[in-house]
Amino acid sequence: MQPEQIIRRPIILTEKSSRLRDQGNKVIFEVRREANKIQIKDAIQTLFKVGVVDVNTLIMRGKDKRMGRGYAKLRNWKKAIVTLKEGDEIQFFDEKAE
């Protein structure tokens, strides 16, 4: 798999991801369910040019959603919590110092 196919999107707008980013130099990504920790680590290092110390993965259970009168289940997805090397940082937005 190509690195672009492994990493789906960063999860940056939650309280937990903001807290982990500020306290522990960790970043959260949604990744493909088939990807393992080694592939995720290599993809992050290739795409963002940062050092990765650790990768923790979780399978998130899909939610039940209302569809008309019935319910449909969303797919399960995989979340990766990536610990970056001390001093490395990933900028998702162009942050201006004010």
From Swiss-Prot:
GO terms for cellular component: ribonucleoprotein complex; ribosome. InterPro entries: Nucleotide-bd_a/b_plait_sf, Ribosomal_uL23-like, Ribosomal_uL23/eL15/eS24_sf, Ribosomal_uL23_CS. One of its GO terms (biological process) is translation. PROSITE patterns: RIBOSOMAL_L23 (PS00050). Transmembrane segments: none annotated. One of its GO terms (molecular function) is structural constituent of ribosome. Keywords: Ribonucleoprotein, Ribosomal protein, RNA-binding, rRNA-binding. Part of the 50S ribosomal subunit. Contacts protein L29, and trigger factor when it is bound to the ribosome. Belongs to the universal ribosomal protein uL23 family. One of the early assembly proteins it binds 23S rRNA. One of the proteins that surrounds the polypeptide exit tunnel on the outside of the ribosome. Forms the main docking site for trigger factor binding to the ribosome. This is Large ribosomal subunit protein uL23. It comes from Sorangium cellulosum (strain So ce56) (Polyangium cellulosum (strain So ce56)). The lineage of its organism: Bacteria, Pseudomonadati, Myxococcota, Polyangia, Polyangiales.
